[in-house]
Amino acid sequence: MFVVCILAVLMDAGPSGITGQPQGAVREVVAESKPQDPAPAATGGGSLAWRGYFGLEGRLFPHSPAVPGQIRHGLFLVAQPEISYTSADRRHRINATLFGRFSLSPTYGSADVRELYWQYRQDRWSLLAGMNRVFWGATESRHTIDIVNQSDLRENYIGDVKLGQLMVAATLQRGWGQLEFYALPVFRPRAFPVSDDRPRLLLPVKGHEVLDGPPVDVAARVSISRGDGDLHAYYFRGVNREPNLVPVFDATGAPIRLTPNYKPIDQFAADVQYTLGSWLLKGEVFHRITPDARYQSAVGGVEHGFSRLFGGASDIALLAEFQFDNRPDTEWPAPATRGVFAGMRLAVNDTRSSEAKAGVVHDFPSHSWIIKADFSRRLTDQWGLSFAFSGFGNVGRSRALADFSRDSYLTITLRRYL
């Protein structure tokens, strides 16, 4: 019925807009550093293009692991190829993006279909079906309202890296803005690291349970742009992407593992951006209703940009944000409940696309902090090198970070772009 209702209103819509790409927020520079897409190859009536990368990734941990058997250092083969076909009339598009990571010692791996969709575009509307990634949010330090896709914690402990999500989605353009409708028929549980990997929770996470979730998750989103401001608001009804972790005990009463427990939710959320000269004001907030509780989460702050730093070509942005979260202790913990973030982003604007980003989040109630720093640079048109550091400090009182007290790490990645 949801899809039928969408199709019934398609005839009175405007330009299309389902791309699955971020709006407003800045992705990690490690993920964004790549050469321009290659020119598409002609295939009769349409065009075929391929992109992506493969490479080597090393993870270095300065501290010994908290759990026996975990890696001290890791070396991985990583690959993310993407191929897309666009018809001659540019109405049809088929896109496939795969991802794989394989450890060289010890031997284990993970793989996922990030995208595998067909999209049809008209001048006044578009329709998409298949696996896709959709990003919602505006802030830098935390993407609290991003809910369509499930998190892949094997790649990023904070949950910013997402699994592909099966969906049917339609975009309509009206005179006052844009409407998006989503039907998400298959729920995907959160992907947790294997027992050898780091960083991970001290207890292994196995299995999962979904409590009385709807057969199909649904979402509707509205986007309005006026002058220098952008506003997005959505309603989501479905299974919570953040599980409760229920301990399982042995015969002696000692916890031996955690089982994720997923509950149905209703969530209302919004994000906003407003440009004021060289200042960018941005924020996002949600109100979540579960069978057991109602709570809110919000992030808001400012970004101030400086162009042509010291008379050169470099641009720098200074960032400051505040994080708020009042969820109860029974829910998946937030990294910061009353936190502040300060950071910077540097674009050198040289021929090798050198970029850097660094920031610190401090949580006042737990006195914990997280530091992140990224740097990336193209060595040639096809090869790129990146460094990413994640550090945890004074996390003993943090529900979200206490298990990572010995898991600060540096990631070095060498990529060959396709």
Each PLM stretch: what is its role?
Residues 6-68:
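N-terminal periplasmic/intermembrane-space "pro-region" immediately following the signal or transit peptide
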Residues 69-77, 109-114, 162-166, 214-218, ...:
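Residues that define the transmembrane beta-barrel architecture of outer-membrane proteins
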Residues 84-197, 227, 394:
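Outer membrane beta-barrel
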Residues 276-363:
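Detector for outer-membrane/organellar transmembrane beta-barrel domains
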Residues 302, 404-418:
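Outer-membrane beta-barrel "beta-signal"
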Residues 54-64, 93-104, 114, 151, ...:
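Transmembrane beta-strand segments that form the barrel wall of outer-membrane beta-barrel proteins
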